UniProtKB/Swiss-Prot annotation:
Homotetramer. Interacts (when phosphorylated at Ser-19) with YWHAG; one YWHAG dimer binds to one TH tetramer and this interaction may influence the phosphorylation and dephosphorylation of other sites. Interacts with NT5DC2; the interaction results in reduced phosphorylation and decreased catalytic activity of TH. The modification Phosphoserine is found at S19, S62, S71, S502. Phosphorylated on Ser-19, Ser-62 and Ser-71 by several protein kinases with different site specificities. Phosphorylation at Ser-62 and Ser-71 leads to an increase of TH activity. Phosphorylation at Ser-71 activates the enzyme and also counteracts the feedback inhibition of TH by catecholamines. Phosphorylation of Ser-19 and Ser-62 triggers the proteasomal degradation of TH through the ubiquitin-proteasome pathway. Phosphorylation at Ser-62 facilitates transport of TH from the soma to the nerve terminals via the microtubule network. Changing R441P: In ARSEGS; complete loss of tyrosine 3-monooxygenase activity. The gene is TH. The lineage of its organism: Eukaryota, Metazoa, Chordata, Craniata, Vertebrata. This is Tyrosine 3-monooxygenase. It is an enzyme of class 1 (oxidoreductase). Changing T276P: In ARSEGS; parkinsonian symptoms in infancy; no effect on tyrosine 3-monooxygenase activity. The keyword Cytoplasm applies. Changing G428R: In ARSEGS; phenotype with prominent levodopa-responsive myoconus-dystonia (M-D).
Length: 528
């Protein structure tokens, strides 16, 4: 069997473990030397203090025994070296072994993984042997359970083990090799590696990947491409978003007279259409925003003020962003009831259209709808469905978002109304969507998720929902079919994502549900 390179992370890990074992066992095994003094007969407080000669009788001393201590250390060293050597030999011989894909999560040099394995019929005490392997590599066990075997072999055990553990990334290959030596059918229930996603709201600081497709510095067709003053202004406002961290108040922007004039033209033009084209939820929230959050034609509302308004209404908060975010990062923010919102405004030469999201689009289109409880939940559900989803599913969810949150229609009082932010912030498309020209289809998440769309001109197809509640129910049904090795739940108290990947995690979540049910039952009892 080839000897592993002494410089590999696995070999270094073994040497460290052996060194620690030497120290621990040296303390645990008390060995008395040949010339050590015997017990004192005079009651001297100091071991080894000589008693008077007349009363002292030397006692025979046992010969020093070091064989067992040396044997333990030598056995441990050989065992670890053998495991490293076995891992070094096994990895190249298994080219199809998905060692790198088995990690569920990686952070600070540690890999967290889920494993399933079955005991070998020829080796008793398979679980204790596997646990010994985990101890060898100083793995931290998060969860361990036995399960009925999903694919028992003829004459083999009908039991398998599931373990979730954390181990140094450099020791992963050797640990897996060690588990294979004492058990069989070692595999990961999670399958392919799950993409990283934020677990805490503060981790949204990492969700800042921008799409530069419509950046005025790069897009030749952008209205502001040839305007150096506008481009410099955009960079100045974008820096606010780049410096922002969760928990900070959103810095205020002093808008120029030209920017306010652009806002005024958009504001007054669209407001004239809302009464006949916008849904009731938008109209109700818009009136409240005018009353409490500085919405008026001669003032561009500040994000901090609007964020406080939304927080009180539906729990949603705003967060400044420098431009168009990647779909994965943007949808992940919605899972925490956080909406990434731009602060810059479109170019003055094109007030009725912007190739990218700007504050007119966000404040006039998105914010009023996020003030509605049912719609806010619908938006968060899309975000929750995106966490840990594959790239293919992210593309479908972002398309679904496009045809609902951005360009969705709904039925109200026998009429079709607009609720999508892309419609409510675009005068031309708001007229177009309710004309006879486009095709109107009943909302079906499966169809909407794969429907081709336009981002350069008006849509040729729109989807109409019976109600927001109906759309929410259909979305949840669609999301339940997304393949993930876990489910997720938002904790509104800690603003964190609970990953439901074990019976214990589900049980903890149910305890909170039971508390809420008890409160509601008590309320009904008091009312009755």
């Amino acid at each position: 069997m080839p000897t592993p390179d002494a410089t590999t992370p696995q070999a270094k890990g073994f040497r460290r473990a052996v060194s620690e074992l030497d120290a621990k066992q040296a303390e645990a095994i008390m060995v008395r030397g040949q010339g050590a003094p015997g017990p004192s007969l005079t009651g001297s407080p100091w071991p080894g203090t000589a008693a008077p000669a007349a009363s002292y009788t030397p006692t025979p001393r046992s010969p020093r025994f070091i064989g067992r201590r040396q044997s333990l250390i030598e056995d441990a060293r050989k065992e670890r070296e053998a495991a490293v050597a076995a891992a070094a030999a096994a990895v190249p011989s298994e080219p199809g072994d998905p060692l790198e894909a088995v990690a569920f999560e990686e952070k600070e040099g540690k890999a967290v993984l889920n494993l399933l394995f079955s005991p070998r019929a020829t080796k008793p005490s398979a679980l204790s042997r596997a646990v010994k392997v985990f101890e060898t590599f100083e793995a931290k066990i998060h969860h361990l359970e036995t399960r009925p075997a999903q694919r028992p072999r003829a004459g083999g055990p009908h039991l398998e083990y599931f373990v979730r553990l954390e181990v140094r990334r450099g020791d992963l290959a050797a640990l897996l090799s060690g588990v294979r030596q004492v058990s069989e059918d070692v595999r990961s229930p999670a399958g392919p590696k799950v993409p990283w996603f934020p677990r805490k709201v503060s981790e949204l600081d990492k969700c800042h990947h921008l799409v530069t497709k419509f950046d005025p510095d790069l897009d030749l067709d952008h209205p502001g491409f040839s305007d150096q003053v506008y481009r410099q202004r955009r960079k100045l406002i974008a820096e606010i978003a780049f410096q922002y961290r969760h928990g900070d108040p959103i810095p205020r922007v002093e808008y120029t007279a030209e920017e306010i004039a652009t806002w005024k033209e958009v504001y007054t033009t669209l407001k004239g259409l809302y009464a006949t084209h916008a849904c009731g939820e938008h109209l109700e929230a818009f009136a409240l925003l005018e009353r409490f959050s500085g919405y008026r034609e001669d003032n561009i509302p500040q994000l901090e003020d609007v964020s406080r308004f939304l927080k009180e209404r539906t729990g949603f908060q705003l967060r400044p962003v420098a431009g168009l975010l990647s779909a994965r990062d943007f949808l992940a923010s919605l899972a925490f009831r956080v909406f990434q919102c731009t602060q810059y405004i479109r170019h003055a030469s094109s007030p009725m259209h912007s190739p990218e999201p700007d504050c007119c689009h966000e404040l006039l289109g998105h914010v009023p709808m996020l003030a509605d409880r049912t719609f806010a939940q619908f938006s968060q559900d899309i975000g929750l469905a995106s966490l840990g989803a594959s790239d293919e599913e992210i593309e479908k969810l972002s398309t679904l978002y496009w045809f609902t949150v951005e360009f969705g229609l709904c039925k109200q009082n026998g009429e079709v109304k607009a609720y999508g932010a892309g419609l409510l912030s675009s005068y031309g498309e708001l007229l177009h969507c309710l004309s006879e020209e486009p095709e109107i289809r009943a909302f079906d998440p499966e169809a909407a998720a794969v429907q081709p769309y336009q981002d350069q001109t008006y849509q040729s197809v729109y989807f109409v929902s019976e109600s927001f509640s109906d759309a929410k129910d259909k979305l949840r049904s669609y999301a339940s079919r997304i393949q993930r090795p876990f489910s997720v739940k938002f904790d509104p108290y800690t603003l964190a994502i609970d990953v439901l990947d074990s019976p214990q995690a589900v049980r903890r979540s149910l305890e909170g549900v039971q508390d809420e049910l008890d409160t509601l039952a008590h309320a009904l009892s008091a009312i009755g």
